[in-house]
């Protein structure tokens, strides 16, 4: 406070100069009013706050000067100062002030003790008596306003420049004493001598007045960094502050009482006016209320600002300067210096008046002088913390609002004390209204009269200004947390209130965002208790905690130029906008919580329905406002989905639940409510779509083209707006779908239209495809459902729940396919004679056991064990050919989905070749029909599903480009096979088109080329699918080059893909695609050509890598023919690309294209190689038998050998006898059980499990079985390990060395055979662990069998049992007389008697290899 009050010190010369300058202008009271009216207030702003400028006239630490030697020198100085101020218009005093400021900065930190010493000067007894006499005369509280803390002047320590300072202070004091003696005449003198505003501010006193305004309310005892550097022991305890609470207003413990009314809102005179008892009582009162602060009331000090309305204008400037001077002197002398000075010397009364307008406006010269003074300041710290002028400036706003003086203020006559004098709203008393006014509430503010203190002006007793407007007494709460801003009204920016809880509904919730930007557009409090830097570039940051930020020019005058860059301003405004958006979302969350609680009830009353409608309306308004304010923020916060879920989805589901509830009283009323809600939603989203287009300036018609990649980049806001528009369209489709379900209808055309529009806006989003799949499921179109679910998974942002939906679809398809297969078998078995004939040939009894019956069914025909494959094929072909196109199409779709279900689920892949063969046969027959029953769109869906199967089955963690999984190769083989059949059909149709063109008379001129316009309709239907698959092949060459292993298909179905493509390329070269010219670059008369298949498959991930070059055609050209020309051009480029591969697949030789692709391992070559291997094995068998006979003859000579052989014979005989007894017991048990129930085994051999002896003795036979491609050879891992052990050789007896070498060689050949086949990834060969895990490679074939029960034979048998999945519900008959029927697809191939017996006990079919070869008719 002392720092602020020191600014109002006015020298005598300055005051004399003011009086001399304004003497000619002295006039009547009306002239003063006219002068005041010339400065009107703008927007009800208070002009008394405008004067503040941070960082000016810090004149606290002036150098001290010696006292003048005599009164003559003092008088001469007064005259000189008066002349200077009158002639030079205040220029020199400003230079002196700058000089003093430079000296102050050079002297270092500010010393409060020095300040007191600087302002102390001797006073005479007469002056003291006159001061006391004046105080007694002006004792009434309505005339005097007391400011607390009047200082006692002290003699400070030594200072080099003290003489000059004290000389000025003595002059001011002498002037003040003279004015006290003629109190009654001063008022008139001030009216006459009212100075001009500009001339006042040109003088040094005017500068100090402005400095005092900037420093008002600042207490010298505040515990801050600049006070800590003062080590002067004379300062004492009152000058240092240890507290950091912002609400604790500490006062001088030696503060004296006043002779004025105790109820006044300001303090009394200094220590010289009272005795020690009064001082102690005031100290006690301060201790009792240490935290009372910033009280706002209509008491004496609060009325200062309002009183200025009715007071004479001429009194304002003089009175204002005098009051500031008096308050500065009273405050600057507080502390220890009060005790050291002569307390009875300072008893004069300073009368200071305030001009509400003059205080807030500056003349240009004053502003320039202020700028000069700012420039004259060196960048040195003015505080102990070493802060510069910026820090000091940022501190001034805080100092301004805590003014509390201790002098006596003589209010002029006719002073209006109403709270709305400045035209401010009623909230104005809550903020800092006066320079030393309402913000300076001390402990005495709660004296007699409280906050509604009445003030009377003796000169105008009829007027009672204090009763004009009164504010309610404040309710004080916690004073420690005072960082909340408050509102000032509409006409001014928000300023910090004196107390946080005055007009705040929720004072504890004012969040502040970290960073350079302010939380709100108005200034507030800084929560820190230590000095901080500026918070933004517009307003200087608060320096002290709990103090309001700058008032004055930042409220009432135009804002100064911002130092923030445009980017920072934009970010600042964006932060503010996001805060508003977060607030809206918080409000919406609250509303949604109420709505959810309402919907959670079992029954909803009519009042609840009305409340629900109200909450929904508020939610829609809040969410719509968020979307239209900041579309990017809304997308990040997912406001679109939250809007749909909270305002529509949960309400719709509640109504649907109530409609289905049988206990609901009036379901029709609920249904009508539901339909009204759906209509409301449709209208809302239609409106939102229009508002999005208007707000973000785009048209939806320009973007519903289905392009995933655009030539020109979109604006950021348009991109987000398109995403929001797509979600709105999806919501429209959902509403249309719910409407159909509510009406119990199934016309989903409108919903499908909305979903397709949404897909065209952003094709990479998977949500529209998922919704389209739902519609396909509702309408039982399984192919469409699978297609859209796959599109949903193969999108840039996939819908992962589609995977579960696909799993359920494929499971249902599998059941239907099995039912269809069973139905076909029943149709084949209509003839009972053939069935009995075939049945008798397949029955075989096991020994003499009549209770066990095995029915062996050959895989070539379901009715007979004998039959040819050709007969089966011709019969099935005749059956497919006899079907209608629609029935054939249904059967094909079912088979196609069944095959892809195996590829997707990877279950039942052992039957995939058979299912794929069926798919290809039906597809081939379908293509023969004209017109094609599939259609262009359905054909595109088939190709898309094939692409997805290859894409979905690729290895995720494989970094090698040549690495492909078995599932991926099978999926690629199926796709290429269907593509080859499609290309064959196109080649045939192209030839037909060429023949038709030759027969056409108008095309005889050009017989060599085939015109695109002459294409037959079936060819036009197929070309888009061929083009799309070729695009995929160009984008992913690693999936088909080198070519994958082809499926094992019959010769009439298996087609060489690359030979077919070569033939297609030869016929395609004859097509003239230049019938419609195509252009690469755009032009004014050209238009972009978009193919229908490209638009339909836009956003499909497997096709994103395909080349997508734009193509332009003339606007007048035929778009249909132009599209076919583009397709032909793309196909020609694709076929040329096959010739340009690193390993070319096509080549141009002898004037035509031929296939140069490496031929896969065909069945013929394998047959030849395996036949040669079989002959070699037979020759080796003969040699082995001869070698065994020779070895026996050689070993029969010795007697020891004979005895050993006899002993072995006896041991074997005993062992055989034991086994026979065991077998008899087993047979007896079986007979006992078989008397009650007969068992039938239906054996359809598919999996063949050989043991180790089978590879040693019958390797060639196993190779023939493998080459037949009818069976899958399953090799247990334990058999491979045994073969490895035999191949290494373990000779323990030299006499058996020859046979061991033979066995070792056969085992080695078996291992080589298996490794070769596994390396080539033979689909009919697989390895199986003892736990039932299939292996695609035997590179790692060691198995840990610890914990496995039994020997190796048991492990082999466990592999067979892996394929025997018996379920009681499947084989147990309904009646006791019927036999138990078991289905077996596995056969154990072994000669081991023990293993065969174990297999029979477990109902596992078993045969030796030669017998099975005879039955299977292989070899």
From Swiss-Prot:
**Record-listed Mn(2+) binding positions:** 1251, 1353, 1392
Give the residue ranges for region: EJC-binding motif 2: 133-153
* Basic residues compositional bias, start-end: 279-294
One of the record's GO molecular function terms: metal ion binding
Q: Which GO terms describe its biological process?
A: nuclear-transcribed mRNA catabolic process, nonsense-mediated decay
List cofactor names only: Mn(2+)
UniProt entry tagged with the keyword Metal-binding:
yes
Task: Name a single GO cellular component.
Answer: cytosol
Low complexity compositional bias: what residue ranges?
A: 258-272
Q: Which residues carry this modification: Phosphothreonine?
A: 471, 479
Where is the region Disordered?
26-77, 99-167, 179-405, 419-470, 854-883
Keywords noted in UniProt: Chromosome, Coiled coil, Cytoplasm, DNA-binding, Endonuclease, Hydrolase, Manganese, Metal-binding, Methylation, Nonsense-mediated mRNA decay, Nuclease, Nucleus, Phosphoprotein, Telomere
**Compartments reported by the entry:** Nucleus, Nucleolus; Chromosome, Telomere; Cytoplasm, Cytosol
Q: Which residues form a coiled coil?
A: 166-190, 575-600
Q: Which Gene3D superfamilies does this chain map to?
A: 5'-nuclease, Tetratricopeptide repeat domain
The Enzyme Commission number assigned here is: 3.1.-.-
User: Compositional bias of type Acidic residues: which residue ranges?
Assistant: 303-314
Q: Where is this region: EJC-binding motif 1?
A: 39-59
Give residue spans, biased composition: Basic and acidic residues.
30-51, 64-77, 182-231, 328-348, 368-380, 388-403
Give start and end of each PINc domain. Answer: 1246-1397
Q: Which domain of life is it from?
A: Eukaryota
Assembly description: May form homooligomers. Associated component of the telomerase holoenzyme complex. Interacts with TERT, independently of the telomerase RNA. Interacts with SMG1, SMG5, SMG7, UPF1, UPF2, UPF3B and the PP2A catalytic subunits. Also interacts with the exon junction complex (EJC) composed at least of CASC3, EIF4A3, MAGOH and RBM8A; required for the process of nonsense-mediated mRNA decay. Interacts with DHX34; the interaction is RNA-independent.
UniProt cross-references to PANTHER family, sorted A to Z: SMG-7 SUPPRESSOR WITH MORPHOLOGICAL EFFECT ON GENITALIA PROTEIN 7 (PTHR15696), TELOMERASE-BINDING PROTEIN EST1A (PTHR15696:SF0)
Entry remark concerning the domains of this protein: The PINc domain confers endonuclease activity and is expected to bind the catalytic metal ion.
> Which purpose does this protein serve, as stated in its record?
Component of the telomerase ribonucleoprotein (RNP) complex that is essential for the replication of chromosome termini. May have a general role in telomere regulation. Promotes in vitro the ability of TERT to elongate telomeres. Overexpression induces telomere uncapping, chromosomal end-to-end fusions (telomeric DNA persists at the fusion points) and did not perturb TRF2 telomeric localization. Binds to the single-stranded 5'-(GTGTGG)(4)GTGT-3' telomeric DNA, but not to a telomerase RNA template component (TER). Plays a role in nonsense-mediated mRNA decay. Is thought to provide a link to the mRNA degradation machinery as it has endonuclease activity required to initiate NMD, and to serve as an adapter for UPF1 to protein phosphatase 2A (PP2A), thereby triggering UPF1 dephosphorylation. Degrades single-stranded RNA (ssRNA), but not ssDNA or dsRNA.
Q: What is the name attached to this protein's record? A: Telomerase-binding protein EST1A
Native organism: Pongo abelii
Report which gene this protein is encoded by: SMG6
């Amino acid at each position: 406070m002392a720092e602020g009050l020191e600014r109002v010190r006015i020298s005598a010369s300055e005051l004399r100069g003011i009086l001399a300058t304004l003497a000619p202008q002295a006039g009547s009271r009306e002239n003063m009013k006219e002068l005041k009216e010339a400065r009107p207030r703008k927007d009800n702003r208070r002009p008394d706050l405008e004067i503040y400028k941070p960082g000016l006239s810090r004149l606290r630490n002036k150098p001290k000067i010696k006292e003048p030697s005599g009164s003559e020198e003092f008088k001469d100085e007064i005259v000189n100062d008066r002349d200077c101020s009158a002639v030079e218009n205040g220029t020199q005093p400003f230079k002196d002030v700058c000089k003093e400021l430079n000296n102050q900065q050079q002297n270092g930190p500010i010393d409060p003790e020095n300040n007191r010493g600087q302002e102390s000067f001797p006073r005479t007894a007469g002056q003291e008596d006159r001061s006391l006499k004046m105080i007694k005369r002006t004792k009434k509280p309505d005339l005097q306003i007391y400011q607390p803390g009047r200082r006692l002047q002290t003699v400070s320590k030594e200072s080099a420049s003290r003489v000059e300072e004290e000389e000025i202070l003595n002059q001011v004091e002498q002037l003040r004493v003279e004015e006290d003696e003629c109190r009654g005449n001063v008022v008139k003198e001030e009216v006459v001598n009212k100075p001009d505003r500009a001339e006042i501010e040109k003088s040094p006193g005017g500068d100090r007045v402005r400095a005092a305004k900037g420093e008002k309310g600042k207490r010298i005892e505040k515990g801050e960094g600049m006070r800590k550097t003062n080590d002067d022991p004379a300062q004492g305890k009152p000058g240092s502050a240890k507290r950091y609470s912002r609400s604790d207003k500490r006062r001088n413990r030696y503060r004296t009482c006043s002779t004025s009314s105790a109820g006044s809102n300001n303090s009394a005179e200094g220590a010289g006016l009272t005795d020690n008892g009064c001082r102690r009582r005031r100290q006690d009162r301060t201790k009792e209320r240490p935290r009372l602060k910033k009280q706002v009331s209509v008491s004496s000090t609060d009325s200062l600002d309002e009183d200025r309305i009715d007071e004479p204008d001429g009194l304002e400037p003089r009175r204002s300067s005098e009051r500031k001077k008096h308050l500065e002197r009273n405050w600057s002398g507080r502390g220890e210096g009060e005790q050291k000075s002569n307390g009875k010397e300072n008893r004069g009364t300073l009368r200071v008046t305030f001009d509400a307008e003059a205080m807030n406006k500056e003349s240009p010269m004053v502003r320039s002088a202020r700028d000069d003074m700012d420039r004259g300041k060196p960048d040195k710290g003015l505080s102990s913390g070493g802060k510069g002028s910026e820090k000091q400036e940022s501190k001034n706003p805080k100092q301004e609002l805590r003014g509390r003086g201790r002098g006596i203020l003589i209010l002029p006559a006719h002073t209006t004390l109403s709270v709305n004098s400045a035209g401010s709203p009623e909230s104005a008393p809550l903020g800092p209204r006066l320079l030393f006014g309402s913000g300076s509430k001390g402990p005495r503010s709660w004296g007699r009269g409280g906050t509604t203190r009445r003030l009377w002006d003796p000169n105008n007793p009829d007027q009672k200004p204090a009763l004009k407007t009164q504010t309610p007494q404040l309710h004080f709460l916690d004073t420690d947390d005072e960082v909340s801003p408050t509102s000032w009204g509409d006409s001014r920016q928000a300023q910090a209130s004196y107390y946080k809880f005055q007009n705040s509904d929720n004072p504890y919730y004012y969040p502040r965002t970290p960073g350079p930007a302010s939380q709100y557009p108005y200034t507030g409090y800084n929560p820190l208790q230590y000095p901080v830097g500026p918070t933004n570039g517009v307003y200087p940051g608060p320096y002290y905690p709990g103090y309001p930020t700058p008032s004055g020019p930042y409220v009432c005058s135009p804002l100064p130029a911002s130092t923030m860059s445009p980017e920072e301003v934009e970010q600042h405004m964006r932060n503010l906008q996001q805060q508003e958006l977060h607030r809206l979302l918080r409000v919406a969350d609250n509303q949604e919580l109420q709505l959810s609680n309402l919907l959670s009830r079992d029954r909803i009353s009519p009042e609840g329905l009305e409340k629900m409608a109200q909450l929904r309306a508020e939610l829609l308004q809040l969410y719509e406002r968020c979307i239209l304010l900041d579309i990017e923020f809304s997308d990040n916060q997912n406001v679109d989905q939250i809007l749909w879920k909270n305002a529509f989805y949960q309400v719709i589901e509640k109504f649907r639940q109530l409609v289905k509830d049988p206990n609901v009283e009036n379901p029709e009323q609920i249904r009508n409510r539901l339909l009204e809600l759906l209509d409301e939603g449709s209208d809302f989203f239609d409106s939102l779509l229009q508002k999005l287009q208007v707000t973000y300036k785009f048209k939806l018609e320009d973007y519903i083209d289905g392009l995933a990649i655009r030539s020109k980049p979109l604006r950021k806001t348009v991109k987000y707006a398109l995403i929001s528009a797509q979600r709105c369209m999806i919501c429209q489709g959902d509403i249309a779908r719910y409407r159909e379900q509510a009406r119990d209808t199934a016309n989903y055309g409108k919903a499908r239209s909305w979903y397709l529009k949404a897909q065209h806006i952003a094709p990479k989003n998977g949500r529209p495809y998922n919704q389209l799949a739902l519609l396909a499921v509702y309408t039982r179109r399984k192919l469409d459902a699978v297609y859209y679910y796959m599109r949903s998974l193969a999108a840039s942002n996939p819908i992962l729940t589609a995977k579960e939906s696909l799993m359920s679809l494929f499971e249902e398809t599998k059941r239907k396919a099995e039912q269809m297969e069973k139905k076909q078998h029943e149709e084949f078995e209509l003839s009972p004679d053939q069935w009995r004939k075939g049945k008798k040939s397949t029955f075989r009894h096991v020994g003499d056991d009549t209770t066990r019956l095995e029915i062996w069914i050959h895989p070539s025909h379901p009715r007979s064990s004998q039959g040819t494959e050709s007969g089966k094929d011709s019969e099935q072909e005749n059956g497919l050919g006899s079907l209608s196109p629609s029935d054939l199409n249904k059967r094909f779709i079912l088979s196609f989905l069944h095959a892809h279900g195996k590829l997707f689920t990877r279950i039942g892949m052992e039957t995939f070749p058979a299912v794929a063969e069926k798919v290809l046969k039906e597809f081939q027959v379908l293509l023969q029909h004209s017109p094609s029953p599939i259609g262009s769109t359905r054909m595109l869906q088939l190709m898309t599903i094939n692409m997805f199967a290859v894409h979905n089955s690729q290895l995720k963690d494989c970094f090698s480009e040549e690495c492909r999984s078995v599932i991926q190769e099978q999926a690629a083989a199926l796709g290429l096979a269907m593509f080859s059949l499609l290309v064959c059909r196109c080649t045939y149709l192209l030839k037909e088109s060429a023949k038709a063109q030759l027969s056409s008379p108008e095309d005889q001129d050009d017989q060599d080329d085939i015109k695109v316009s002459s294409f037959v309709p079936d060819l036009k239907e197929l070309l888009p699918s061929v083009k799309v698959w070729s695009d995929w092949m160009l984008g992913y060459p690693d999936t088909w080059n080198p070519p994958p292993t082809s499926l094992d298909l019959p010769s009439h179905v298996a087609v060489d893909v690359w030979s077919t493509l070569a033939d297609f390329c030869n016929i395609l070269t004859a097509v003239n695609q230049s019938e419609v010219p195509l252009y690469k670059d755009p032009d004014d008369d050209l238009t972009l050509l978009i193919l229908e298949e490209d638009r339909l498959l836009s956003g499909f991930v497997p096709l994103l890598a395909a080349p997508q070059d734009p193509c332009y055609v003339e606007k007048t050209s035929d778009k249909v023919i132009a599209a076919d020309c583009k397709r032909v051009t793309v196909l020609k480029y694709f076929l040329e690309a096959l010739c340009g591969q690193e390993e070319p697949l096509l080549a141009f030789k002898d004037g035509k294209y031929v296939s140069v692709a490496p031929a896969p391992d065909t069945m013929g070559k394998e047959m030849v190689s395996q036949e040669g291997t079989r002959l070699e094995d037979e020759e080796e068998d003969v040699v082995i038998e001869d070698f065994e006979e020779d070895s026996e003859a050689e070993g029969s000579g010795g007697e020891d050998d004979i005895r050993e052989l006899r002993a072995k014979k006896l041991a074997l005989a005993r062992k055989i006898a034991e086994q026979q007894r065991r077998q008899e017991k087993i047979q007896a048990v079986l007979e006992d059980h078989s008397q009650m129930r007969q068992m039938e085994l239906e054996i359809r051999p598919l999996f063949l499990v050989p043991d180790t002896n089978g590879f040693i003795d019958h390797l060639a036979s196993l190779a023939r079985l493998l080459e037949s491609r009818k069976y899958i050879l399953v090799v247990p891992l334990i058999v491979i390990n045994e073969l490895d052990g035999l191949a290494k050789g373990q000779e323990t007896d030299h006499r058996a060395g020859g046979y061991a070498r033979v066995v070792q060689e056969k085992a080695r050949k078996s291992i080589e055979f298996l490794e070769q086949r596994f390396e080539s990834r033979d689909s009919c060969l697989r390895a199986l662990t003892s736990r039932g895990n299939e292996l695609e490679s035997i590179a790692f074939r060691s198995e840990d069998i610890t914990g496995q029960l039994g020997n190796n034979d048991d492990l082999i048998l466990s592999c067979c049992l892996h394929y025997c999945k018996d379920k009681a519900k499947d084989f147990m008959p309904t009646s006791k007389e019927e036999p138990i029927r078991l289905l077996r697809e596995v056969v154990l191939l072994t000669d081991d008697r023990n293993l065969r017996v174990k297999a029979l006990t477990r109902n596992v079919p078993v045969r030796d290899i030669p017998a099975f070869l005879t039955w299977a008719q292989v070899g």
